[in-house]
A protein has these predicted regions:
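Sec-dependent N-terminal signal peptides
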Residues: 4-12
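Lipid interaction determinants
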Residues: 14-118
Length: 118
């Protein structure tokens, strides 16, 4: 009986976590928000970032380049030597929250244009 109760509460916590997520953007909404703009923010796993997302699908950071693209309702990145990494996003105004595994794991501020001349 304890096992079933533990499983029930574990499952319930997953539903609560998913219910706490902000509304997720469509692929088209993500593309419209980031293409041609810079996003500055922080990710739980890797810390601060500043990236420019060119309309041609190129990502530029301070000392690197990568590729970005929309697949369905996810934004995917391909950094040199790394596997493709796809995330969902919640966008409200100029604020983006990056969502993976039903958790917000990063945030950013969308700034118009290539403000750092990457």
């Amino acid at each position: 009986m304890r096992f079933y109760l533990a499983a029930f509460f574990l499952a319930l916590s997953g539903y609560a976590q998913a219910a706490d997520l902000p509304p997720l953007a469509t692929g088209e909404q993500i593309k419209k928000a980031v293409a041609g703009n810079t996003v500055e923010g922080s990710m739980q796993a890797s810390g601060r970032y500043t990236e420019f997302y060119a309309k041609d699908g190129t990502v530029s950071g301070k000392d690197y380049k990568a590729v970005w693209r929309i697949e369905g309702d996810s934004m995917c990145w391909i950094y040199k030597g790394q596997p493709k990494d796809c995330w969902r996003a919640s966008i409200k105004g100029t604020t983006v929250q990056w969502v993976k595994d039903n958790k917000v794991q990063g945030t950013g501020n969308i700034v118009k244009g290539n403000v750092n001349n990457f």
